[in-house]
Curated annotation (Swiss-Prot):
Name listed for the protein in its UniProt record: Enolase-phosphatase E1
Entry keyword set: Amino-acid biosynthesis, Hydrolase, Magnesium, Metal-binding, Methionine biosynthesis
Originating gene: mtnC
NCBIfam families per UniProt: enolase-ppase
GO MF, any single term: acireductone synthase activity
HAMAP family for this protein: Salvage_MtnC (MF_01681)
Assembly notes: Monomer.
EC number assigned by the record: 3.1.3.77
Cytoplasm as UniProt keyword: no
Naturally occurring in which organism (per UniProt): Gluconobacter oxydans (strain 621H)
GO BP terms in the entry: L-methionine salvage from methylthioadenosine
Amino acid sequence: MIRLVLLDIEGTTLPISFVRDVMFPYAAKALPALMQDHTNPIVVGARADIVMEHPGQDPLKVCQDWMKADVKAAPLKTLQGLTWRQGFEDGTLQADLYPDVPPALKAWSKGGLRLAVYSSGSIPSQKLLYGHTAQGDLTPLFEDFFDLSTGGKKDAASYEKITAAVGLPADEILFLSDIGAELDAAQRAGLSVCQLVREQDGTVPHPGVPQAPDLNAVSTQFGLPVA
């Protein structure tokens, strides 16, 4: 019996196009000015982490290279999160989730399911995104948020940590993602899994795992409350 649904964001609840075409360009444009802020301890800490990992290199150039290569480095995610905070809070950015997502999340929560997020984006970024959607503030629906500080999403140990944190048997947790390697890692940790194969994102079906085109289909497959 599924008691908690653990959700990825990009390609699962939010179109990849929004992240790729809206959020990433916004962060790229704002990052140079942010990196010059020597008073914000979060920026200072992230910059120090980059210098430690890439001595002798310009931290901004490292971040720009990471973005071009779509490297999900923790310092970059932290810095991107700061730029997105400004954008969401001033109304420049507003997350437009897949239309099936808000009603499904509300139905699951109302039906007694626990909900949590596991994304490569920082926890503050996750909360900003779900707090500023075109469908309103959805953060109260979630009890936990996990990011790369828990570990990599393709590492089974990360899902073991999440299982311990939420205090449930692994098979009572359903992990939803569009990425096959993440689903494989979650399966190795004992979680139930389902791949979201969103047609508009061109998701490639991953063999060996259940698949669904949207959250309504997930509800049907796993006997969850239906919106």
